[in-house]
Amino acid sequence: MSSAVPLNVGITRSADSGASRADGEKRVLLAEPRGYCAGVDRAVETVEKALEKHGAPIYVRKEIVHNRHVVETLSDQGVVFVDETDEVPEGALLVFSAHGVSPAVHESAAARNLRTIDATCPLVTKVHQEAKRFARDDFDILLIGHEGHEEVEGTAGEAPDHVQLVDGPDSVDAVTVRDESKVIWLSQTTLSVDETMQTVARLRERFPSLQDPPSDDICYATQNRQVAVKAMAPECDLVIVVGSRNSSNSVRLVEVALGAGAKASYLVDYAREVDPAWLDGVRTVGITSGASVPEILVRGVIDLLDEHGFHDVQPVTTANETLVFALPRELRAART
């Protein structure tokens, strides 16, 4: 399933780098695609439609998506975010976040007679299904991801006796398997593609028969946003990534920007967090945003840069995204 069409990047290249542009000639390179992915759009709309249908309060386990603005906005509308199901009144409505949950969480919700709506991203659900399938076939599953991330906890919970977490290349040496002929790697959907491939290469050095997942686990949106940043970063004195610090894919965009040649890169939730000192001597600023970031926050950064003389905004388009996910079954009639 392809959701992206490669396009001409179309950056007007400077002679050497953004810093060599003529004095006073400032520009913004605006990464496209950026912001909401199909899974985040579905999750946020799920909560909004649930509010319309059932009224406040409704409960959401963890953050529906990892974005401060989204969570605060929904909280103001009557959504109550909780860490665990035992914080939800018996019989209440609980929405599971886009990151997915383990079978144990589903069982806990059922034990409290909670009405549930599952907003798990379908691409995360795909990884869950892969974990269950390979556990049934008695494989050792090496799950590449970040310890403590909700998505990793949910996926590992599908087959706890078969899954080992591999948190980056430096964790590879600690991995042990029962049968080197029955080992497969899966991954969190929001990782750096490059770092994940480094981890896989290290794993394959130890386990030559390591199998790849049936299809890419790192989601199309994560990959597309990283590709766009790589395209513009060599031209940038500064790359501003709009996103929250607990957003894995947003943090990865900062790392990708620096690795691809940007002289500096910072993560901000809001335009007001941009330090004017970052702009000293800067001629080219790149802007992108994580997959859980509403476009209004990006526009705020563009407006701020305009006040500092960055009037020329050039899109850097590397893909067009067209994928849309259906709402959860309980809410499909409510979609407009």
Swiss-Prot record:
Sites where the protein binds isopentenyl diphosphate: H66, H99, H149, S247, S248, N249, S292
Pathway linked to the protein: Isoprenoid biosynthesis; dimethylallyl diphosphate biosynthesis; dimethylallyl diphosphate from (2E)-4-hydroxy-3-methylbutenyl diphosphate: step 1/1; Isoprenoid biosynthesis; isopentenyl diphosphate biosynthesis via DXP pathway; isopentenyl diphosphate from 1-deoxy-D-xylulose 5-phosphate: step 6/6
Positions of [4Fe-4S] cluster binding: C37, C121, C219
Annotated catalysed reactions: isopentenyl diphosphate + 2 oxidized [2Fe-2S]-[ferredoxin] + H2O = (2E)-4-hydroxy-3-methylbut-2-enyl diphosphate + 2 reduced [2Fe-2S]-[ferredoxin] + 2 H(+); dimethylallyl diphosphate + 2 oxidized [2Fe-2S]-[ferredoxin] + H2O = (2E)-4-hydroxy-3-methylbut-2-enyl diphosphate + 2 reduced [2Fe-2S]-[ferredoxin] + 2 H(+)
Xref: InterPro entries: LytB/IspH (IPR003451)
Pfam families, per database record: LYTB
Annotated active site: E151
Cofactor binding notes: Binds 1 [4Fe-4S] cluster per subunit.
Listed CDD domains: lytB_ispH
Top-level taxon of the source organism: Bacteria
Cofactor: [4Fe-4S] cluster
Keywords tagged on the record: 4Fe-4S, Iron, Iron-sulfur, Isoprene biosynthesis, Metal-binding, Oxidoreductase
Protein EC: 1.17.7.4
UniProt keyword Metal-binding present: yes
Binding site for (2E)-4-hydroxy-3-methylbut-2-enyl diphosphate: H66, H99, H149, T189, S247, S248, N249, S292
Enzyme class, spelled out: oxidoreductase
Molecular function GO terms recorded: 4 iron, 4 sulfur cluster binding; 4-hydroxy-3-methylbut-2-enyl diphosphate reductase activity; metal ion binding
GO process terms (BP): dimethylallyl diphosphate biosynthetic process; isopentenyl diphosphate biosynthetic process, methylerythritol 4-phosphate pathway; terpenoid biosynthetic process
Binding site for dimethylallyl diphosphate: H66, H99, H149, S247, S248, N249, S292
Functional note: Catalyzes the conversion of 1-hydroxy-2-methyl-2-(E)-butenyl 4-diphosphate (HMBPP) into a mixture of isopentenyl diphosphate (IPP) and dimethylallyl diphosphate (DMAPP). Acts in the terminal step of the DOXP/MEP pathway for isoprenoid precursor biosynthesis.
Family to which this protein belongs: Belongs to the IspH family.
Protein name: 4-hydroxy-3-methylbut-2-enyl diphosphate reductase
Phylogenetic lineage: Bacteria, Bacillati, Actinomycetota, Actinomycetes, Mycobacteriales
